[in-house]
Structures are given as C-alpha cells and as structure tokens.
Amino acid sequence: MIMTTPLADAMSQLVIYDSLTGRKQSFKPLVEGKVGMYVCGMTVYDYCHIGHARVMVGFDMAVRWLAQLGYDVNYVRNITDIDDKIIARAAENGEEIGALTQRFITAMHEDATALGCQSPNAEPRATDYIDEMQQMIETLVSNDYAYAGDNGDVYYAVDSFADYGKLSKRNLDDMQAGSRVEVENDKRNPFDFVLWKAAKPDEPQWVSSWGQGRPGWHIECSAMSTKCLGNTFDIHGGGHDLQFPHHENEIAQSEAATGCEYARNWMHVGFINVDGEKMSKSLGNFFTIRDVMAKYLPETVRFFLLSSHYRSQVNFSDSALDEAHNSLSRLYQALKVVEQQKGQTLIVDDALINNAYASAPGQDFIKAMNDDFNSSTAISVLFGLARDINKASKVEDIESAWQLAQQLKALAQTLNILQQPVQQFLQAVIGEAAEDGLTDEAIDSLIIERADAKTNKNFARADEIRIQLKDAGIELEDSRAGTTWRRA
C-alpha cells in the first residue's frame, strides 16, 4: 500500500519568483524529485557580515523547504579563494594567502553553524577548478566569444552574445551610449570583462595557453557550477548585488560555452540596510555576523532574517533585533507554559510533523512556503498557533494546548527555529545579561515571561521575576496598557 503524507501534493504546487522572467512560476525540476541548486558564496578575505548572513539563512530556508517537500537537493555553494581583495589583504597582513583564506573559511563555517544553517552538499573552492576554467575559456576563444589581448589578459566579448543583459534587463546599446567607462587599451568594448588575468609579480599564477596568470571572478562560478551540477541546473542564487554584472556575465559565459540554458530559475536575496542607510565601512555601520551575535542570540538573528520575505529589503537596527528577540521569546514562552502544565517536554518526530501539516495551520504554512518561500507569512501562522495555545492554557484545556504546541514546534522545525529546549533558550537570555548586568533585551524578555505567568495564574513565578528585576535595580509599573520599566 502506498503511504501518502500531507505534503505529497504540495511538491507540485511550489512557485518561485524567477529574476530572469520577472514573475512567479511553477517549479518544475529538470529531473523529477531532484533539485540542483548553486549559490554564489563568499570571497574569503574577511569575516562574514550581516548581508552574508541573510544569504546563508535565506537559501538554508529554501533548501530545508525543498527537502521537506520531498526533493533530493544537491546544494552547491562555492568559495572564492583567489581574488584581488584576497591578494591585497594577505599582502597587508604579511600572511600567506592559503593561511588567510583557510582562517576565514573556518570562521565562515562557524558563523553559518551558529545561525542554524546546514552545510551545502558541496563547497567547491576556485583554486581546485583552474583546469575547468581554462577549458571553458578555450572554448569561448575558439568560438569567437572571447579574445586575448596583447597584455596577456583574455576578455569576453559582450557584443558576441545576443542576449547579454537579459537577466538585469539592461540593453547593451543603451549602456554604451550612456557609458563613462574608460576603455582599456586591450578591450574592444568598455563592457568586455576579463576571463584570464596575466600574471603580476608576487601573485598566485597558473600555466595557461595565454601565459602565466589567474582566472577572473566571473569565470570561476561558471566553471564550478557546470562541473558540479551540469550545463543546466534548476536554481542559481545569490545576493541581489550580484545580479549585475556577476550573474549576467555568468549567463553569457556559460550559455556561449555550452549552447545550453544555464539556470532554470534565478533567486536573489534582498539588500540589508542599517538604520535606513546602505551598510558600508565608510559610514561606520558595517557589522560582521560576529559583531551581531556578540549582542544577540544566534537564533534571534536567524528569526529576524526569516521574519521578512527573502526578496524584500530589510532594515537592520537594534530596535528591529530587539523586536525579533521579544517575538521569538513569546513563542518560546507559549511552549514553556504548556510543558509546565503537561509536565512533559515537547519532542518532535515524523508522525507529529505529518499531523502538523495535516492541520489547518499546517495547510496555511504549506501555502505560505510554497508561495516563493514566504517565511514571513509562515511565521505569522506560528504566532496564530501561539495565541491559540495561550487561550487554551488560560482555561487549563491542557490537552488542546499540548496538541497545538506540538503543531507549533513541528512546523517551526522546517525553519529551524524553536528547536532548543525551552529553558535552554530562556536561560541563555538571562545568562548573557547577567555577565554585564541586565540588558534592555533581557529585561523585556523577563517582562514578557512575567505577563505570561500572570495570564496563566502562575503568580509565584510572576513574583519571582518581579523580585529578580527589583534586585537588579529595575522598577516595574503595571497599567491596563501593559508594563513599563525604568532603572532605579
């Protein structure tokens, strides 16, 4: 007998916004039941910043949902370990390039793990694919899509590719008419881009048909993606800032070299602004993932990033992170009350997950995630469950509250939130605050817990929190509008 699950029909209902066509379209993989996904990864010369975190978490969320639907996902995310910035940073530090890149690769993996991201199935490094890059360049040159300059560089001739600009919706003639780009002596067109760079003193270099040199950035991804996933694959992703010129150039190179469509779907993660401004070191608003996680719990950061649709522009600020923390705490508090009433710890298994997706909230969750991975709407489903849990707990309908809590935790598993033991999460908030005195974030979290305790008639716990805050010099003032606080 064939077993069916609530997600059996959902696989065929997934729609993804394709940056190339500019519209949502039904997802139909090249091979039934399998997905090949390539995401442009990091150039490893520094610690990852909060923008990188959004790309990591956004595609981790997408991969998890595809897997939840039943797809066998081959997720490939590259590492650029040879680049002008890497060379410059190594020289500045007086550090070997290999040591520098490995140090930041290790740091990147630590950051991704802290944010709850799964490792990709493959993580190709550019320096391991030099042969494949050279082969692709040779094909482009032999087919008149590329040419060698007198200086030893090899360039891609953008005029040779009729569809150049189709991803970014740019017309080459218009670009040239409005261009102020100074034409390099060896370039035939100011928008021609380098495929192979002639060797410079004290830089890494490899033997090639055009002399000693190293690859350009764009050819790296074309060679690695097609080697790992084939000439055509299902999804290509990255940050919105890569759409032009990087992804545009990848299409031009790959489709000219193979004669095949490059990627079936293009996904781009939106920008992160900081306090309403573009993040940049010159503005002093540049934050690494480690900067942020020194102040906020990693799960809070993940929750913040998932609370907006992956394509939307997000404003990063302390107030936004505080709000995310308080919202996440409310979900954990709902679970805590139920566990206390039931006298058991919630444990999610496959049966519970199937039951959760069969429920009305589960169907709403599926609908949200199948609508271009809309994690924001999916999270609103979780809050609806939390409200129902609190209502049931308040009237001591313990069995209903327990069933709803099982649904909440099971659905949240797909987003990899709410999976810590409840007390571990709440103690982490209080523990961090205790190191330097209670932070505003920790105070707000305790006030939320106190309010929930009062709602559920756990007055002993409510008094404990009031006393704890009083001992820390925090005075509370209760009113019909809620609780406010001030430092004594």
Curated annotation (Swiss-Prot):
GO MF annotations in UniProt: ATP binding; cysteine-tRNA ligase activity; zinc ion binding
Sites where the protein binds ATP: 281
Biological processes annotated in GO: cysteinyl-tRNA aminoacylation
The enzyme's E.C. designation: 6.1.1.16
Cofactor remark from the record: Binds 1 zinc ion per subunit.
Pfam families: DALR_2, tRNA-synt_1e
Motif ('KMSKS' region): 278-282
Localisation: Cytoplasm
Annotated GO CC locations: cytosol
Keyword Nucleotide-binding: yes
Main location as per UniProt: cytoplasm
Subunit organization: Monomer.
Similarity section: Belongs to the class-I aminoacyl-tRNA synthetase family.
Protein name: Cysteine--tRNA ligase
Natural source organism: Psychrobacter arcticus (strain DSM 17307 / VKM B-2377 / 273-4)
Gene from which the chain derives: cysS
